[in-house]
Amino acid sequence: MNLLILFFGYLFGSFPSGYLAGRIAKGIDIRSLGSGSTGATNVLRHIGKRAAIIVFLLDVFKGVLSILLAKYLLLNDSWQVAIGLSTLIGHIWPVWLNWKGGKAVATGLGIFLGLSWQVGLATLGVFIIMITLFRIVSLASVSASLALPLIMFLSFSGSNISLPFLIVSLLAMLLVIWRHRENIVRLIRGKEPRIGQP
């Protein structure tokens, strides 16, 4: 039963919201433009603000939904984390799109809002601060992912620490950094575009 739920978690994550936005709004394949990502940032740059907001909310919802399902079924922390990871993997490597999906940020946010809304909101706060200061989405995304494990650790007190939650925060951080490796190179070179730039 739990393995079946992992499969459905992957299917939730692999729902191609950004790809569908491109096809419906402009008849384009968003994967062929810009970063090639199906995430909200690439949608914003090549389709528009309204489509980007919808894609962002749908991607967050995918993460939240998978964790809420796990909690509804009274699954323990380890299984909640496993389902969250399967959803994140589905978002990054969707079978429907030849394994080419998003960069794990919005769906990752949804997963951590589901696991611990306080951690999710605090991590979102880091993103908002960085995007306000620098107006570079990738910098804000990487900064928030780096802060995530520390925020998760600080959210627990004493013996109340959930090892699965800490592990998944580290894995999510690594996935986000890996998916942004090209952005990081451009950041180092000072060539990463800000919001409003192509």
Swiss-Prot record:
Q: List the disulfide bonds.
A: none
What is the annotated localization of this protein? Cell inner membrane
Q: Give a GO molecular function annotation for the protein.
A: acyl-phosphate glycerol-3-phosphate acyltransferase activity
The entry's keywords: Cell inner membrane, Cell membrane, Lipid biosynthesis, Lipid metabolism, Membrane, Phospholipid biosynthesis, Phospholipid metabolism, Transferase, Transmembrane, Transmembrane helix
Catalysed transformations (reactions): an acyl phosphate + sn-glycerol 3-phosphate = a 1-acyl-sn-glycero-3-phosphate + phosphate
Please state the Enzyme Commission number of this protein: 2.3.1.275
Q: Which GO terms describe its cellular component?
A: plasma membrane
- Give the membrane topology: Multi-pass membrane protein
Q: Which SMART domains match?
A: G3P_acyltransf
Q: What does the record note on quaternary structure?
A: Probably interacts with PlsX.
Question: What's the stated role of this polypeptide?
Answer: Catalyzes the transfer of an acyl group from acyl-phosphate (acyl-PO(4)) to glycerol-3-phosphate (G3P) to form lysophosphatidic acid (LPA). This enzyme utilizes acyl-phosphate as fatty acyl donor, but not acyl-CoA or acyl-ACP.
This chain's protein is named: Glycerol-3-phosphate acyltransferase
Q: Which gene encodes it?
A: plsY
